[in-house]
């Protein structure tokens, strides 16, 4: 099993996609916990197809990060005690009897916002996409915060 949260979820799926065939066969499941997707090119070859049925995505009901970029897998939506972007913190995800409390789906307004953001991102040339992501992380880094709670307090 390979698992990760946020960028770690993206990296788990990416590593499994490009692993050697022998390694891919040994991976039983890939879990991406509110991890972003990929650019469409990742899905074009056979590499991703070899693992697709083993990829499990778990997202909070107001997910932003996990809905970024292209995603082909179905996803499970869970309840969260967080509000907005704070739902990205997996410690806010609701658990009952050792299992995630399931939500019906991603909120409709969040889906619309995610679609608009993704449409915009996909219009950018590769260099500008990279610059956007790097700048976003630099801005967050400059705040000096280390948790989403701290981030929301200073926002």
Please place each PLM-identified region on the residue numbering:
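Alpha/beta hydrolase fold serine-hydrolase catalytic domain that processes acyl esters and thioesters
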Residues: 1, 19-155
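Short glycine-/acidic-enriched loop or helix-start segments at secondary-structure transitions
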Residues: 12-13, 42
């Amino acid at each position: 099993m390979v698992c990760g949260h946020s960028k770690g979820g993206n990296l788990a799926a990416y590593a499994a996609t490009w692993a050697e065939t022998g390694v891919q066969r040994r991976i039983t499941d890939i879990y991406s916990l509110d991890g972003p997707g990929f650019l469409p090119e990742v899905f074009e070859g056979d590499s991703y197809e070899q693992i697709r049925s083993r990829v499990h995505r778990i997202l909070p009901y107001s997910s932003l990060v996990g809905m970024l970029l292209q995603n082909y897998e179905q996803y499970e939506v869970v309840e969260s005690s967080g509000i907005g972007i704070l739902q990205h913190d997996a410690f806010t995800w609701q658990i009952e009897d050792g299992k995630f409390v399931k939500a019906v789906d991603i909120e409709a307004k969040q889906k619309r916002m995610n679609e608009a953001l993704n449409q915009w991102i996909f219009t950018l040339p590769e260099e500008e996409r990279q610059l956007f992501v790097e700048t976003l992380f630099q801005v967050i880094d400059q705040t000096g915060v280390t948790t989403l709670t701290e981030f929301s307090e200073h926002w």
